[in-house]
Amino acid sequence: MRLHVKLKEFLSMFFMAILFFPAFNASLFFTGVKPLYSIIKCSTEIFYDWRMLILCFGFMSFSFLNIHVILLTIIKSFLIKKTKVVNFATDITIQLTLIFLLIAIVIAPLIAPFVTGYVNTNYHPCGNNTGIFPGAIYIKNGMKCNNGYISRKEDSAVK
């Protein structure tokens, strides 16, 4: 293989490992993981969409894929030799990527009704929505909505 072909391969993998996958993972984190964490934390105001579960497991899958691409980039740049340990590490990262991708596609939609049930029993939609709608803001039961903001602090300050 010519040197310029190896250089092109290395630069494309380096671009994916350093720029593309971290940017993609950041978007998955802020759209999938962070809102689900607010549900786990029992926040007073949450944003819920059942597809966030798919994004959460997709975040884990693409994190392992990013590690896999970084390992391959290091191997391509000849910084480490290809040994049994390195081969094992690359095999494990691609297997974990596929496992979490399978969970995101198959199991996450099956878990979604249970999370939706939890949201419906402990929260109510803030707005004119009746029922569960994708991308709705919910607040804890017993609290009032005021233009999408929680007005409990204002009510306690008036009394």
UniProtKB/Swiss-Prot annotation:
Task: Report if keyword Transmembrane helix is assigned.
Answer: yes
Q: What is its main location?
A: membrane
Membrane-traversing stretches: 10-30, 52-72, 96-116
Q: Which GO terms describe its cellular component?
A: membrane
Protein's UniProt keywords contain tRNA processing: no
Q: Where in the cell is it found?
A: Membrane
Q: What is the lineage of its organism?
A: Bacteria, Pseudomonadati, Pseudomonadota, Gammaproteobacteria, Enterobacterales
Cite the entry's keywords alphabetically. Answer: Membrane, Transmembrane, Transmembrane helix
GO BP annotation list: DNA damage response; response to antibiotic
- Mind telling me what this protein is named? Uncharacterized protein YkfM
- Give the gene that encodes this protein: ykfM
* Membrane topology, as annotated: Multi-pass membrane protein
